[in-house]
Amino acid sequence: MLRDIIRSKKLEVKELMKKTPLSILRDDITVMDEPVSFPAAVGGGKVSLICEYKRASPSMGRISERGLEEMMEVYQDLADAVSIVTDGKYFKGSLDLLSGATDYGKPLLMKDFLVDEYKIYQARASGASSVLLITGVFPDLEAGIQKCRELSMEPLVECHTSLDIFRALEAGAEIIGVNNRDLETFEVDLERTHALAPLVPDELILVSESGVRGPEDAEILAGYGADALLIGTAPMSAQNPRELLEEIVDAVSQCRDRRRRYTGDEFFEQFA
């Protein structure tokens, strides 16, 4: 599935560049305000929530018919940042959703399978504060991170293995995501965060992605050392999204038994 998605994304970028040349995106960005800081929102010392608007997924099919406005009203009160899934073919998302979410003043993560710097420009021109760069999918991670920073964004660099994390660190990532979902099988294992969290120096921001069904899962991941949790399917499919997120916020705010991660010096002493 992942190979099919990447192939589709490469074709998509070619078509997008024909319709909207990069020069137009650059011109649009020059007259835009600076985006709301993503690192400040998700790295403030408490366990933060990145709540996602996601209509569908390859593993679950259609997830929710709820509109963007309905969910953003909930997220505005309870989320520290918002992730907008923009892929249309597999997740039923769009850039219009990202642009629409800018009205609420939250830092926005454009979540897609980026394979070219063009999409970084597109994200910024649509109001994003951050983009998802997947280790092993984006072709030049260091260049992608630098391009984001040139455009006043800080990317979330997604990892699945210890090697991914070392590559992300070498590329200069400051926000590292551990995806608990296997992108090939779609199986979820929260223990992936448990195993990989010690590899992320304490000075950086660690985001645990996928698998939070309720407050118990959130408390477990907070205990593993996550600085932020990316939550999408649970609130989108919940009968009462606000009540669910209130329970999750309460659970992580009361989590006192958080595993300490290594500082930079300790990290290099441990793993050099």
Curated annotation (Swiss-Prot):
GO biological process, one term: L-tryptophan biosynthetic process
Keywords carried by this UniProt record: Amino-acid biosynthesis, Aromatic amino acid biosynthesis, Decarboxylase, Lyase, Tryptophan biosynthesis
InterPro entries attached to this UniProt entry: Aldolase_TIM, Indole-3-glycerol_P_synth, Indole-3-glycerol_P_synth_dom, Indole-3-GlycerolPSynthase_CS, RibuloseP-bd_barrel
Protein name (Swiss-Prot/TrEMBL): Indole-3-glycerol phosphate synthase
Record's catalysed reaction(s): 1-(2-carboxyphenylamino)-1-deoxy-D-ribulose 5-phosphate + H(+) = (1S,2R)-1-C-(indol-3-yl)glycerol 3-phosphate + CO2 + H2O
Domain of life of the native organism: Archaea
Enzyme nomenclature, EC number: 4.1.1.48
Family recorded in the similarity comment: Belongs to the TrpC family.
Alphabetized GO MF terms: indole-3-glycerol-phosphate synthase activity; phosphoribosylanthranilate isomerase activity
PROSITE patterns: IGPS (PS00614)
Enzyme class: lyase
SUPFAM superfamilies given in the database record: Ribulose-phoshate binding barrel
Pathway participation: Amino-acid biosynthesis; L-tryptophan biosynthesis; L-tryptophan from chorismate: step 4/5
Pfam families: IGPS
